[in-house]
């Protein structure tokens, strides 16, 4: 699982990148329901990041119903992943896209216009 993680210095917090990459791996079926994830310490050491960063990513994944953490046993992909994104997830996703756009030098009004065109509303 660790070999597929690629963290970048792109203005997006590391815990967000880690959380999103794990969630995407679950969504694509790379991490199957019930699969055990590496320990937080293993992830922190392998990626040369702070343990608190990994803890925050795992905690948010658990909050979102993607992971289940069992004290003394480890972290596992939830047997029944969440079905629909919540409104808070949509806002968070939009905030991440906005941060990426700004880091790339794209004005937010340009981004909004491009999204409207993609949605078929000009």
Positions of PLM-derived features:
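Beta-hairpin "wing" of winged helix-turn-helix
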Residues: 30-35, 60-72, 78-79
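N-terminal helix-turn-helix
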Residues: 36-67
């Amino acid at each position: 699982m660790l070999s597929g993680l690629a963290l970048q210095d792109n203005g997006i917090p590391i815990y967000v990148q880690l959380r999103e990459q794990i969630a995407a791996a679950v969504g694509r079926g790379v991490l199957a329901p019930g699969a055990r994830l590496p320990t937080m310490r293993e992830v922190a050491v392998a990626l040369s990041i702070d343990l608190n960063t990994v803890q925050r990513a795992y905690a948010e994944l658990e909050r979102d119903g993607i992971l289940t953490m069992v004290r003394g046993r480890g972290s596992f992909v939830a047997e029944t992943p969440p079905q629909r994104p919540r409104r808070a997830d949509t806002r968070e996703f939009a905030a991440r896209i906005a941060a990426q756009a700004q880091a790339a030098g794209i004005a937010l009004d340009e981004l909004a216009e491009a999204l409207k065109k993609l949605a078929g509303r000009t």
